[in-house]
Structures are given as structure tokens and as C-alpha cells.
Amino acid sequence: MSQQETHGFQTEVKQLLHLMIHSLYSNKEIFLRELVSNAADAADKLRYLALTNDALYEGDGELRVRISADKDKGTVTIEDNGVGMTRDGVIEHLGTIAKSGTAEFFKNLSGEASKDSQLIGQFGVGFYSAFIVAKKVTVRTRAAGHKADEAVLWESEGEGSFTVETITKASRGTEITLHLRDEEKEFADDWRLRSIITKYSDHISVPVEMWQEGTPERDGPDGEKIPATEGYWKVMNKATALWMRNKSEISDEEYQEFYKHISHDYTDALLWSHNRVEGKQEYTNLLYIPSKAPWDLWNRDRKHGLKLFVQRVFIMDDAEQFMPSYLRFVQGLIDSNDLPLNVSREILQDNHITKAMRTGITKRVLGMLEKLAKDDAEKYQQFWAEFGQVLKEGPAEDFANRERIAGLLRFASTHTGSAAPTVSLDDYISRMKEGQTKIYYIVADSYDAAANSPHLELLRKKDIEVLLMSERIDEWLINHLTEYKEKQLHSVTRGELELGELEDAAEKEAQEKLAEESAPLIERIKAALGTKVADVKVTSRLTDTPACVVTGEGEMSTQMIKLMQAAGQPVPEVKPTFEVNPAHPLVSRLNDLQDETAFADWSNLLLQQAQLSEKGSLADPSAFIKLMNQMLLANMK
């Protein structure tokens, strides 16, 4: 036996242990679910490694998890004969949290137990859940293929440090003993443990066993002798792969528990789909849409993807090749009959079977969402609030399914008068005016900026609906979604408004006449502004505002420029078109000014006002304020 070493926990582990004990007290029994789940994973990993090295079984190929309790000592032990851990593995896995974005996770914690328990559940507490009920945890483990005297003893009271020493252990695998707190001794009761196992572990494909005490010889009711029975390890769960069972035999509760097993989430899934595909490819998939977004959904380093099984043998976690990035929130598994057992991530990358399965699974998920949107709008809104921004990546990523993805998108709109994104493109089309051929939209920094934009004035007057977009991803989305069901999406802040048949002949004639009458004024403004603008025009979109700026059809939009600048990308200079409203008093009075210096000042002031309204900021706000003060003083004399 080697000398004992003491190690300090990683800072994040200390935080997690403290938070878990104080936040998850209302759901203490999850410790057993987490530890049994880990033990089952260890069995799966050994089964996979043994495909290429049968000697790892060491003559014991019957994989199982065993749970026992000692009431007198107040202990619960969870033992598996899975892959086990080396000394380095123990220090790495039981002393640190090897997850990217961990610091960000802790920043999100509020100190409010109910909210934090949800976040901690999403984070995945795993092994550390033992400390919810245990005052001390002892782990004895030996890695498969290693000698008996290369086993490891790990022990901690969860306070800030743990000890590690080398021991001798005849059997491979891991044995975790929980020394229960005095107030948690109920978990040393056999019946309590059995009820938890039945609740949480039926779906696990590895047998979960508990010791069944034998009975002594005794007299029967009629005086006959009932022979003694020996104690034995009794299997407590169905121990079959849930996804291979008939759907009609699986309860909703079993589906939900299986979701929690594979996702390490402890909130229920929103919906799921269990499907067997037969034909050119044969595979089974069980797909879940979570009810809550994981805390690290936007972390670039976050692993995502499905669990991959081949002929019921676990191959890998996070097989991202079967799911496009815009559906990275989907949890679940795929079990293939066509892929080889020695399949690697590299082989999956360019495999025609993989590509066909990815296509089928993508369509399956989109179908799930379409059905949810049709059957339960309220539940779909719950989904959209959690994952809508991720789904918006779809049209740029998946050209083949662009129209289907577009049908699932939701936006705020001038029709609802609410910031809630509840309007689909189909809803919009169903309300289009007679003769309307375009879907009008605006992208701005916020809902209020979009809803109050002067660019909407004429459209509001004509009661034409406009989609209001204000998420950072919306400009990216709209660059890849130019039409839907043969209706062009048209920005109200770019190029001509193009109302087509929505503008009658009299309006067109009046607009042309106004432009003609205002030609001298337009030329004066052009001369005053010089190279600050690409052009100056009489507006066709304003009714109540003196002026606005628009970008050309082929130019980079204001929001795209902001995105590029935020990403540190070089941005070409884009000069706006300045549109003025001659019917507005400020512009009509501008026409009466004979002093060209004053005329230039007023023209510049109107331009900067319009730019401030459009961009929310100015390149040189000090110059604007100086000019504004100068104009105010001049008019106060």
C-alpha cells in the first residue's frame, strides 16, 4: 500500500459541493440515480473497449451494478464491474470539473435555491451528488487490464480536499461507499433503495442488483417444513435497452427517466420521438427536445450530438455527425445496424450511411417541431423562448430544409403590438393585403427601436403588417432567407419601399408631382451634404418624420455593419441615401432659408437626427451636440 496523498479540490468543485448540498436538498434521492447512471456508463465503456481486447473482461463478462446498504453502519454502497479508473483518472475525474465554460456557469448562479437547483441540474452533478446525503465518500477502484495491486482508494468529506492512495483490489471496476449523514439514514433502508431503483433505473440496460437475504428453514401453516433459501443478488430493473422495446410498452414516466439518464438533466423533456427506420439503412432513434436550454448552449467548445450505439453496443457520446449544429439542443441516441462496431469519428465524418441517417434524423426533428407548433401553440412558445435563436441559424446552414425551418420561425409584429415573438411567416401571409407580394420586415437594436422606427410610418397608415426583428442573429438570418413560399422578404430600411399594387394611381401621381416640385430643394441639400451621403431623395415612406436614412439594396445594412464591428471585422464605408419629407414643416421651412450657411447647418442637423434614429449612435456625437446648441442659440436671439 502506498503512502496516502492529500489533494485540494478545484475551486469550482468546492463551489459546486456547497451549492449542491444547499440547493438540491428537496430532491435528495437523485444521488442514487446519478451514481447508478455513472456505473452503467462504466459498463458500457468496458463493453466497447473489449470489442478489440477481450482480455479486459478478465473472465467476468457479466456486467452489472450492485447496491447494498448497512443500517448499523449507516452506509450505502454502489459497485460496478465496469471499466474502472487509474490513479491519474481518479484525481482528474473526482477532483476537477473538466467542462469548458465552468466559470461562466458559476456567474449565472443567483443564490436563490429554486433557480440555482435548476441550473445545477442542467450542469450535471454526477458523482458529486453523493455529498447531498453523505458526510464522507469512499471510492475503491481498479481499471480493467491493470494489476490487482494498482487499485486506488479515494476518500473525501467534501470539505475542500481528498486523499488518494494505492491499494489492492482483486476485482476490476468501482465501488463507492456513502457514509450517510445522521439525518439521511433513511437511505440505508433496503425498501427505500428498492423504490428509488424502480423509479429511476428500469430503463438502464445493465442489470441493477440488490442483495436478497436468504430465509432459514421454517414450519409452514400446515406443519410442513419449508426449506431454507440462500441469499442472492436479485435484479431490480428490466435491464433491457429501452429504445429496443415496443413503444406501446413504455410509459411516459419511463421515457422521462431515460431522458434524465442520458442528459443528466433533472427536469422533464418537452417532447420526444421514438422511431425505428427500416429500408436501405436500419436504425432506431430516440430523440428528445429539452424543456430548458442548457446553461452552455452558446459555448463554442460545448460538445453536442447523439449517443451512438451499434447493435446495442455503446460506441460514443456526442456523435455530432448525425445532427446539424442548429439542432444542437436535441438529446437522444441512435442505434445502427449498418455501421461497423469499430467505427471512429473520422469514419463517421465521410460515411454515406451517416449522411443518410443525418438527413432522416433532421427531418424527424423538424417534423416533431412542426407537429408541436400545430397542436400546441403555447408549448411551442415555450420551446421558442429556449431555443428559437439557435433555430434561426438553420436557413444559413441547411439549404435543403430552409423552407421548413423558416415555417418554424417566430417574430414580433406590428399586428400584435407586443414584443412577444408569436407570429409565423404563414400567419403573416394569411393576413397580407390584396395585391401585396412582399413580406415586409425591419431589423433594429431593440423591439422599441423597431416598433417606433419612422420607416414604418406609411406602412402603418396603410395597415400593412411589418415583422419586427431585434435579435443579434436576425440580420444574419435574413441574409440567408430572402423568400418564403415565393414571397420575397423586403426590408423597409433598404432601397425603395416597392408597395406595388398597394399604392394606387393617384398616390403615385401625387408622389411624382411632389418629387418634381421638390427637385430644387433636393439639389440644394445634396450640395450642402456633399460626400456624406450617397444620394438625397424625396421619401415615399415617411408621413410624420422630416427625414430618414436608408441603405441601398446591394449595400451592407446598418445592423450587419454593427455585427461585423462587434466581431472585430473590417467594414467598408457605406454612405446612406438621405430621404426627406417635403410635407413636414421642418423641411418646408428649410426650403425658405436663403442663407446657405444656415441651410447647410439645418441639412446636417436633419441628417444626423436621421442617423441617430437609425443607428442609435453617431460617429461624432460631440459635433452633433455642438451644432444643436449653435442652432438653439441662433433661434433664441
From Swiss-Prot:
Record's keyword terms, sorted: ATP-binding, Chaperone, Cytoplasm, Nucleotide-binding, Stress response
Localization, UniProt: Cytoplasm
Residue ranges, annotated region (B): 346-562
Region of interest (C), ranges: 563-637
Pfam families: HATPase_c_3, HSP90
Keyword DNA damage on entry: no
PROSITE patterns: HSP90
GO cellular component, one term: cytoplasm
Main location: cytoplasm
Record's keyword annotation contains Calcium: no
InterPro entries the record matches: HATPase_C_sf (IPR036890), Heat_shock_protein_90_CS (IPR019805), HSP90_C (IPR037196), Hsp90_fam (IPR001404), Hsp90_N (IPR020575), Ribosomal_Su5_D2-typ_SF (IPR020568)
Annotated spans, A: 1-345
GO molecular function: ATP binding; ATP hydrolysis activity; ATP-dependent protein folding chaperone; unfolded protein binding
Subunit record text: Homodimer.
Matching NCBIfam families: PRK05218.1
Function text: Molecular chaperone. Has ATPase activity.
Family stated for the protein in its record: Belongs to the heat shock protein 90 family.
Protein name: Chaperone protein HtpG
Species this chain originates from: Shewanella sp. (strain W3-18-1)
Lineage: Bacteria, Pseudomonadati, Pseudomonadota, Gammaproteobacteria, Alteromonadales
